[in-house]
Amino acid sequence: MPPINTDHLKDIENQLAASRTLEKYQFSSCSRTHIGLVRKKNEDALYIDEQQGLWLVADGMGGIKGGDLASAVVVDNLRSFKRLETLSESIRDIEARFRLANTACRVMFEKRVVGSTVAAILNFESIVVFLWAGDSRIYR
């Protein structure tokens, strides 16, 4: 997977710095996962840190043993996330954490195929960014 190209974000960051009068978004959130009607185990993991502006759902690969563990690894790698000085630095940090989770799963589970998709929202001042890996989606 090629790294995220954040060059275009520098223009947005410059505009944001020039105009600090933009209204900041405020969020109220709650969370819930459900096993659904097909699986015997809930393979979802979620994490919310409103203070850092991060919401994410990791969805373990259904039907493959260990999907619940893989989604937990994704969440564990994001728990210590702290927003950095710029939006592009924060996005690069999240991307690095996604990659670390992928590497951790490969090492932990060796020859077993396990995996998780992830969909995340990052609120950075007045900019909201959607990030994902795999086929999980974010709808408005």
Regions found by a protein language model. Give the residues of each.
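PP2C/PPM-type serine/threonine phosphatase catalytic domain
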Residues: 1-140
